[in-house]
């Protein structure tokens, strides 16, 4: 009898644990060095500030800009030299800087007139905007003061008008001036009795008060008796 054929499966190679660990480790797990913080502003800002402060008529050269950066920001200019040149070229192309001499980054550079005017105009607009609310706040105070002054000024005027009216009424009521006129007029006209009668008629009209009538009536008969005795 023949033996049955037995199938033999090939053995699968099992990965060793040491190799699996090596494959899992990524290369990016290495600790990265922390970047040192910047001790100076960006190159573009430093260069523009250098050109502003130097204010050279013919423009500031690359060497003058470097000296300013060293003195002002204490920067290693040798390391920043390529960045400075790159910014100068791009600033000239964009119109942020004017190149008065040379070509590329080897010439002299100056700020354009338009940039200067914009900066000069912007400053007064801010100052004017701050001053406007102050004026608006001061106006209502002035108006309030004027109103108070007007009301105070009107009151004394009314009081003065009332004071003036009172003495006028007193002068009309006093008939003291009529009494001495009657005494003087009685003895003078001795010869003519007619004018005496006319004066007696005018006297009661002038005297409005009842007090003036009594003394005038008593004096009239005395003056009339004296001329009658002389004629007889």
From Swiss-Prot:
<dbReference type="InterPro" id="IPR005819">
    <property type="entry name" value="H1/H5"/>
</dbReference>
<dbReference type="InterPro" id="IPR036390">
    <property type="entry name" value="WH_DNA-bd_sf"/>
</dbReference>
<feature type="compositionally biased region" description="Low complexity">
    <location>
        <begin position="1"/>
        <end position="18"/>
    </location>
</feature>
<dbReference type="GO" id="GO:0005634">
    <property type="term" value="C:nucleus"/>
</dbReference>
<dbReference type="GO" id="GO:0030261">
    <property type="term" value="P:chromosome condensation"/>
</dbReference>
<keyword id="KW-0539">Nucleus</keyword>
<protein>
    <recommendedName>
        <fullName>Histone H1B</fullName>
    </recommendedName>
</protein>
<feature type="compositionally biased region" description="Basic residues">
    <location>
        <begin position="222"/>
        <end position="232"/>
    </location>
</feature>
<feature type="compositionally biased region" description="Basic residues">
    <location>
        <begin position="147"/>
        <end position="173"/>
    </location>
</feature>
<dbReference type="GO" id="GO:0000786">
    <property type="term" value="C:nucleosome"/>
</dbReference>
<comment type="function">
    <text>Histones H1 are necessary for the condensation of nucleosome chains into higher-order structures.</text>
</comment>
<comment type="similarity">
    <text>Belongs to the histone H1/H5 family.</text>
</comment>
<feature type="region of interest" description="Disordered">
    <location>
        <begin position="99"/>
        <end position="232"/>
    </location>
</feature>
<feature type="compositionally biased region" description="Basic residues">
    <location>
        <begin position="132"/>
        <end position="141"/>
    </location>
</feature>
<dbReference type="GO" id="GO:0031492">
    <property type="term" value="F:nucleosomal DNA binding"/>
</dbReference>
<keyword id="KW-0238">DNA-binding</keyword>
<dbReference type="GO" id="GO:0030527">
    <property type="term" value="F:structural constituent of chromatin"/>
</dbReference>
<dbReference type="InterPro" id="IPR036388">
    <property type="entry name" value="WH-like_DNA-bd_sf"/>
</dbReference>
<feature type="region of interest" description="Disordered">
    <location>
        <begin position="1"/>
        <end position="44"/>
    </location>
</feature>
<dbReference type="GO" id="GO:0006334">
    <property type="term" value="P:nucleosome assembly"/>
</dbReference>
<feature type="domain" description="H15">
    <location>
        <begin position="39"/>
        <end position="113"/>
    </location>
</feature>
<feature type="compositionally biased region" description="Basic residues">
    <location>
        <begin position="205"/>
        <end position="214"/>
    </location>
</feature>
<feature type="compositionally biased region" description="Basic residues">
    <location>
        <begin position="181"/>
        <end position="197"/>
    </location>
</feature>
<keyword id="KW-0158">Chromosome</keyword>
<dbReference type="Pfam" id="PF00538">
    <property type="entry name" value="Linker_histone"/>
</dbReference>
<dbReference type="GO" id="GO:0045910">
    <property type="term" value="P:negative regulation of DNA recombination"/>
</dbReference>
<dbReference type="GO" id="GO:0003690">
    <property type="term" value="F:double-stranded DNA binding"/>
</dbReference>
<dbReference type="InterPro" id="IPR005818">
    <property type="entry name" value="Histone_H1/H5_H15"/>
</dbReference>
